Amino acid sequence: MNRLGFVFQSAPHSTSKGREGLDAILAASAYSEDIQIFFIGDGVLQLLKNQEPEKILSRDYISGFKMLELYDLEEIFVCQNAMGNRGIKEEYLLIDVDSISNKDINEKLSQCDQIMVF
């Protein structure tokens, strides 16, 4: 089976990319167990706790990231540099992740057979 990589690089709620990415992951997990998920750039903002999207009339899909564990999706990586540049610490995040360097992210992405970017 092919290794699938999902990359989140967009801020939440400004577009539908985050919600569509989460939906794509959950759908793909029915067919593949070899899935890696990456949060880079503004994509790290997708995982922040205590977001209130209803205040800007957006749908709350962020809590859906908690479902990744139920789907046995454990290879979830965030970019250390992106978190540092935005003053984000791991305890601010909604789910457990592995914080890794840009180099490690690039290495892992190079091992994916298919990559989808959101």
Curated annotation (Swiss-Prot):
Belongs to the DsrF/TusC family. InterPro entries: DsrEFH-like, Sulphur_relay_DsrE/F-like, Sulphur_relay_TusC/DsrF. This is Protein TusC homolog. GO terms for cellular component: cytoplasm. It comes from Aliivibrio fischeri (strain ATCC 700601 / ES114). Could be part of a sulfur-relay system. Its main location: cytoplasm. It is found in: Cytoplasm. Keywords: Cytoplasm. Pfam families: DsrE (PF02635).
